Curated annotation (Swiss-Prot):
GO terms for biological process: nucleotide metabolic process. One of its GO terms (cellular component) is cytoplasm. This is dTTP/UTP pyrophosphatase. It is an enzyme of class 3 (hydrolase). Its main location: cytoplasm. SUPFAM superfamilies: ITPase-like. Belongs to the Maf family. YhdE subfamily. It is found in: Cytoplasm. Coiled coil: none annotated. The active site is at 76 (proton acceptor). Nucleoside triphosphate pyrophosphatase that hydrolyzes dTTP and UTP. May have a dual role in cell division arrest and in preventing the incorporation of modified nucleotides into cellular nucleic acids. GO terms for molecular function: dTTP diphosphatase activity; UTP diphosphatase activity. It comes from Chlorobaculum parvum (strain DSM 263 / NCIMB 8327).
Amino acid sequence: MTSRRKLILASQSPRRRELLAMTGIPFETASVEIDETFDPALTVEKNVMAISKQKAEAVMWTLPQDAGEAIVLGSDTTVVLDGAALGKPGDADHAFEMLSALQGRSHEVLTGFCILHDGKAITDYARTIVEIGAMTPGEITRYIEVMKPFDKAGSYGIQDPLLACFVTGIDGCYYNVVGLPVSKVYAALKPLFPLDANR
């Protein structure tokens, strides 16, 4: 039976809401603040999956006993340059520093996700290589002033209009860079929300 199953996205990110909606699976949103500091003893891949699980668990623990068969999805995205993870910028100067380092070369974007259901956790991640062309200091400053990318890992949103002129290559899932590897997440959720065979 799937009628009582309810999918909950452990995020208030408008980008992740839009991406999860692409799966066609109805869902609600909820989020709880957690410490998203990376564990230096873990790889970046394990960190994004671990934080995704922590986000999902934090929401799962807040659900009432009569919440039905809840399925909670948590996700975490980071940008990796030369093996170092770049989180969200603290201010405009930090954002400028990040974008100055990213411009004119390629970097990795990793998104981990965790699906909690019936006491079990499904965790995975996706990796995308993004190449950003050369940007002048003025172009970087304008982007920061207009788009205010302070809630984005690496200080940029690949979907932002002012960045489109500088994205010179993508190897992997585009949606992963936006914040959720839609195809991988859908493949993991599909067995939990099977469609009628005649649809």
